[in-house]
Amino acid sequence: MLLHQTADAIIRARENELRKIGISRMKAVVLFIVKAISGPATPAEIARWLFREPHTVSGILDRMERQGLIRKAKDLERKNMIRVVLTEKGEEAYHRSSEIKAIRNILSCLSQGEQDNLRAYLETLRKKALKELRVERSLPFP
């Protein structure tokens, strides 16, 4: 329960911060993933990173495309594949959303050593949870 309440409170603070720049948390996460993926970002790859079904991600990407944050481009080498590319507006939104002031402010109650330990503990827990889910890939952390 403590983990759930803490995560919810931090997420809500982050959503409030993102609302001020006109972007949802999920859209900010998608922008981060597109930037973090080495190689072309595809809807299927984004879905894997988000632990979402492809049709759910497709809806998010459609809304982001209508907002001008991303562009879906056909892959020139593989005609049946779509690549997701950030537009200039998407790049700007990515940079504005990557400031994460709310989370930094929340973490400021911990010393640098405590923050380092927390990060290490969270990475250990994430690794174990991914193993439990039989997911064999590393996920980035900003």
What are these regions (language model features)?
Residues 1-21:
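N-terminal leader segment of winged-helix/HTH proteins
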Residues 30-31:
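Short alpha-helical "packing" element that flanks the helix-turn-helix/winged-helix DNA-binding module
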Residues 37-42:
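Short capping segments at the starts of secondary-structure elements
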Residues 45-47:
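A short acidic, leucine-rich amphipathic alpha-helix
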Residues 62-120:
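Charged, amphipathic alpha-helical coiled-coil/dimerization segments
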Residues 113-142:
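C-terminal regulatory/oligomerization modules of transcriptional regulators
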